[in-house]
Amino acid sequence: DESATSGLPLLMNLGRARPHTHLALTGGSIGLGLPLAIGAAIAAPDRKVVCPHGDGGAAYTVQALWTMVRENLDITVVIYANRSYAILNIELQRVGAIGAGPKALSMLDLHKPEMNWVQIANGFGMEASRATTCEEFVAQYDSAMKSRGPRLIEVMC
């Protein structure tokens, strides 16, 4: 789980999960979610792995999507596409960097160019879809849970 700024609802529902069901970012960096999902899928091939991930952090280790396809791992990646390094904006505030200029703020914005996670995943040979509504996400997620193999769902935030 590397959904640092989008995953709070998920965390609130994991209190009763069995041990080692939720592997999370422990702080200090971003980008480990996709490789962590690979490790979980290799360690427990009989269990489906769901990897909730922010779009900014996923860009750090995007090549992991290729490994998921190459090894035919049963991983569903859910990308929260908020088009921002949102956690880094929060960290700027935490350290008192008030009034960051437009250039600094633009470095944390993921709009220029905009990442299209469906096309990125397809480029690695991975099935992918985009959800723009809750209903679309539920349908795509249900479909992913009923099938084996790697898949990516881009959720537009």
Regions found by a protein language model. Give the residues of each.
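General beta-strand structural signal in soluble alpha/beta enzymes
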Residues: D1-S3, L23-A24, C51, R130, ...
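Active-site diphosphate/adenylate-binding microenvironment
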Residues: D1-A41
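Short acidic loop-to-helix transition motifs that present clustered carboxylates
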Residues: S6-G7, A59, T133-F137
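Thiamine diphosphate
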Residues: E71-C157
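Short gly/pro/ser/thr-enriched loop/turn and capping motifs at secondary-structure boundaries
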Residues: S29-G31, A58-A59, R83-I87
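Short acidic, glycine/serine/threonine-rich loops at helix termini
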Residues: P9-G15, P35, V62-L65, I87-L92
